[in-house]
Amino acid sequence: MTLTQEFDTIAAISTPLGEGAIAIVRLSGTDALKIAQSVYKGKNLTQVASHTINYGHIFEEKRLVDEVMVSVMRAPKTFTREDIVEINTHGGIAVTQEILQLLLRNGARLAEPGEFTKRAFLNGRIDLAQAESVMDLIRAKTDKAANIAVKQLDGSLSKMINNIRQEILESLAQVEVNIDYPEYDDVETMTSQMLLEKTAHFEQLLENLLSTAKRGKILREGLKTAIIGRPNVGKSSLLNQLLREEKAIVTDIAGTTRDVITEFANIGGVPLELVDTAGIRETDDLVEAIGVERSKKALAEADLVLLVLDASNELTDKDLELLELSKNSNRIVLLNKTDLPEKIDSTQISGDFIRISALKNENLNAVEEKINQIFFAGEIEAKDATVLSNARHISIVEEALKALKEANSGLALGLPVDLIQVDVTRCWQLLGEITGEAAPDELITQLFSQFCLGK
């Protein structure tokens, strides 16, 4: 995107394309009001008060296109800090596309993906971490993932990072003064021991932040969960209960699920990417055999394994094989079909297990509790905590920590403070990439290109 494009007027459809009650076509830029007025009949939009909604009609010359409500928001109190117009039309592909084309013909440019949010960032309305949280909020699959995104949009992570960077900067400034003006007696000398204490403090702050990454990443991206078991033990029934809808075929015929079915479920605020695998068994059916191989691959890649056993039958060699195959995984063993007389010998199962009836939806809440225990130590969400959830942020904090550890190692070896300053400065610069203070232009462009059109 060139510099001249940054401040022209852009337009895009901000709601998903398709049939619906309402769609929104958004304009942002210096000429937003003038361009909207050129296709609108009603009150003069260039003269109405800011943050008002106005009733009128969109015309192509003399032909009526739609009856609309138009929101007018004047700079700088807008999302982009530019003039913004939002045209609320009747939902539908044809009418929204026609209105968008009218705006483009009258001087607007089609916005690039994420360009509205990018302008908010470039105009100082939000920082880079807050911009990324906008997309996290849009993509959140559970209320807890949304809560993390909202807190970051409100600036919780940015404030923490900025505070740490400020502390680091003050230490660096003191070192710099000592180096450049050694004759100054009124400035305290930063000794190796003093700097070691400070870098150890910074290291602890980042360690504490990084300790939230596992929980945050799971809540943001979900747990890849493989449902495995012999054919006809109730895997598809379990999938349907967890999804609260029928996605998999449930029959008494072994081998009904011949492929891998993937769906997302919200289990106590944790997004589970549920993979209902084909029953793992020996088979001559080529299609089913491919499904079995995919099942084994899903097991190897899973964050969580739900191993389903048929409690109404004795354990088979295949059951024992699956127990052995999954023993080193984050595994929950489920004894299904407890609505039938129990025949399974549970003493042959090492570790914990949960008795359930997928058919009757009995005791599935125990599965939720076990997931919480395995991945969150019983506390899925710490109130008011700043949580790292974005993979880019996690990687940066890890690199910043590495720089601090190198600084501490150098201090322990007796290296002079001015040499250690290089590693501490690198830590400060890396943390600036989270908020965008030190992010290269290429990174910023790449990040916003991942946004949806119209946001």
UniProtKB/Swiss-Prot annotation:
Binding site for (6S)-5-formyl-5,6,7,8-tetrahydrofolate: 26, 86, 125, 455
Xref: Pfam families: MMR_HSR1, MnmE_helical, TrmE_N
Any one GO CC term of the record: cytosol
GO BP: tRNA methylation; tRNA wobble uridine modification
InterPro entries: G_TrmE, GTP-bd, GTP-bd_TrmE_N, GTPase_MnmE, MnmE_dom2, MnmE_helical, P-loop_NTPase, Small_GTP-bd
Record: residues binding GTP: 232-237, 251-257, 276-279
Cofactor note text: Binds 1 potassium ion per subunit.
Top EC class for this record: hydrolase
Cofactor: K(+)
Family statement drawn from the similarity comment of this UniProt entry: Belongs to the TRAFAC class TrmE-Era-EngA-EngB-Septin-like GTPase superfamily. TrmE GTPase family.
Record function comment: Exhibits a very high intrinsic GTPase hydrolysis rate. Involved in the addition of a carboxymethylaminomethyl (cmnm) group at the wobble position (U34) of certain tRNAs, forming tRNA-cmnm(5)s(2)U34.
HAMAP family for this protein: GTPase_MnmE
Name this protein carries in UniProt: tRNA modification GTPase MnmE
Organism for this UniProt entry: Lactococcus lactis subsp. lactis (strain IL1403)
Gene: mnmE
